[in-house]
């Protein structure tokens, strides 16, 4: 069963201020597509600013893969309104293009049509594009066009002061990092609840499989859709955004030094497979290096410990310097039922679940047990809505029905919700518990259940196109609420100035720059 956290919940009820001041941020990816759903072949619109230097509007792997990043926010409503304002602004400046509302791409005829994201002529800009060239040559470009939502979350210092007795962030960084690793271990053990409730990629276009072998028993529709009847998130499966070669890196989440050492080892360990790709052929770079990971960001994980980096600092060096500052949840598919790809209910659920993960005991986890937890995730990802589906506890030694585990978890989450709602006029968090709990009695009410029903009727391509057009009209017609047009235009212009400044400050050629990285 789930850990008994009754004592921790009683503690929380006595210390409600410990969770006042949670900080959050959202990153949302979305492909630019044409009116008929084809991948846009135009460059990143200049009017949106520099993809290299804009704080809120950038690109991910491909030139057509937009990424929107909110600032850190303590207010859920303000956070989501800011994100929606970015969407409104972009929607008005895409011409006849629109934003694809699903995680899985559809109308991509050939990987050759996927242009890598471009960041200008500076060394740092060329480095970013070359890293993406490496990803393309290692994993294929199509996999990299899969979109998701990342949720950044940090507990206030008051939580760690009350719970762990730390004085301040600097002197308490060891205890705070240990607390976040406890959260992460619980996330690996129980985070499958996220794709169960919010997975929204139960189907793919047949073009996505072109030339790839799979043992998955797909069912077909006449319109060329492939689906698994009980799947929740094919994006998180081996078909999607994962990397099998990373499963034996031995990265664990028990303490900071061991985690960082394993990560640093991975970026220094040569890979025979990637050595065959080569670094440079006929004067053209193919990847940054031939190691298992080109850089630390290449590590695919459903959750990451993070700290804001300083100039020239790697993510792991930042962690060693100051400890874990926040965590990044990476298991959310694009929510197709929201114009911004994520909803208030999801944000509030994640707050509740991540607080639960921080409160619950989490025994240390070996690399073997980490692989064991993957079995539960895979079961939920591929057939989570199957009647009577179970998850394994204690490395598969006990099997329990998902519905049973989910309801036990939600009994705890409701008590956390009552504490959070005590600060508000409305019982928002408790309402989310009521809304989502239904999904354990009726799996067809989950995102994947609702979406697959729709897709079987209309085809996944049609669903994507119809939603894209609906959201384009909706967003481009809405007034801005927390940002102004002047702010957005000024930020875009400032980003171009910053890019030009970065380009003018380069003092060495790209070959020499690469050698210093």
From Swiss-Prot:
* GO BP, sorted A to Z: glutathione biosynthetic process
The membrane spanning regions, by residue number, are none
Q: Which Pfam families match?
A: Glu_cys_ligase
Which reactions is this enzyme annotated as catalysing? L-cysteine + L-glutamate + ATP = gamma-L-glutamyl-L-cysteine + ADP + phosphate + H(+)
Is Mitochondrion given among the entry's keywords?
Answer: no
Highest taxon in the source lineage: Bacteria
Per UniProt, which keywords does this protein have?
ATP-binding, Glutathione biosynthesis, Ligase, Nucleotide-binding
The record's annotation in SUPFAM superfamilies points to: Glutamine synthetase/guanido kinase
Quote the cellular component terms of the Gene Ontology held in the record. cytosol
Biochemical pathway: Sulfur metabolism; glutathione biosynthesis; glutathione from L-cysteine and L-glutamate: step 1/2
For the keyword Ligase, the answer is yes
What GO MF annotations does this protein's record show?
Answer: ATP binding; glutamate-cysteine ligase activity; metal ion binding
Which enzyme class, named as a word?
A: ligase
Q: What is its EC number?
A: 6.3.2.2
Instruction: Give the protein family.
Output: Belongs to the glutamate--cysteine ligase type 1 family. Type 1 subfamily.
Q: Which HAMAP family does the entry link to?
A: Glu_cys_ligase (MF_00578)
Full protein name = Glutamate--cysteine ligase
